[in-house]
Amino acid sequence: MKIGIIGAMEPEVAHLIQSLTSAEHSLIAGIEFISGQIAGKDVVITRSGIGKVAASIATTLLIEKFAVTQVVNTGSAGGFVDSLKIGDIVISSEVRHHDVDVTAFGYEIGQMAQQPAAFIPDAALVEAAKKAVSALGEVKAIEGLICTGDSFICDPERTKVMRANFPTMAACEMEGAAIAQVCHQFKVPFVVIRSLSDNANNDSPVDFDSYIIKAGHHSAMMVVALLTEL
């Protein structure tokens, strides 16, 4: 077992890197990969960079160059569930693109041509994540739909459209569906775990800057706890 862990930004992986033992650094295509162990498990951590293309490159390299057998995506997200507050966790029940539209050819909104409408995470990884929640104390965690697009969402009109298109969406972010799609094609189990940094509204840019460290730390703590469950 070797677990690939992907975060887009430094605050999303800093706690994980600090938790590594026997760390070895590699640089491929301008992306740093750090191999080592956490909780006795072999892991490779990478800060992919922001967005779907960057995440796809990093995921492919984890699978092809480092032979990871499972992938965990960690980081921050904008919340779409009123009962959740900043710092709370969403564990993926499914992952979809929210900015894809080829409905003219009979596909669902959010479904890329020749791909499934939703990418379903590995059941064992989801269960391990749910068991790991207790390590976070009073932080609330739910399973839910996570949607991905190459935009930071803070426009109320755009939020309204997204809610109409994906009424069960719990969180939105900028990498998860790309990671999930790569894992789907390589048949590698995955899970997406996101901590809320904002609520996808007009205040989101301010909230994000203020709370990204908190959200990244919560999500990373969740991943460390998950690794102890595997």
From Swiss-Prot:
Q: In which pathway does it act?
A: Amino-acid biosynthesis; L-methionine biosynthesis via salvage pathway; S-methyl-5-thio-alpha-D-ribose 1-phosphate from S-methyl-5'-thioadenosine (hydrolase route): step 1/2
Source taxon at top rank: Bacteria
Q: Which UniProt keywords apply?
A: Amino-acid biosynthesis, Hydrolase, Methionine biosynthesis
Q: Please name the catalytic residues of this protein.
A: 12, 198
Q: What class of enzyme is it?
A: hydrolase
Q: Name one GO cellular component term.
A: cytosol
Fetch the Gene3D superfamilies from UniProt.
Answer: Nucleoside phosphorylase domain
Q: Which reaction does it catalyse?
A: S-adenosyl-L-homocysteine + H2O = S-(5-deoxy-D-ribos-5-yl)-L-homocysteine + adenine; S-methyl-5'-thioadenosine + H2O = 5-(methylsulfanyl)-D-ribose + adenine; 5'-deoxyadenosine + H2O = 5-deoxy-D-ribose + adenine
Protein family per UniProt: Belongs to the PNP/UDP phosphorylase family. MtnN subfamily.
Q: What is this protein called?
A: 5'-methylthioadenosine/S-adenosylhomocysteine nucleosidase
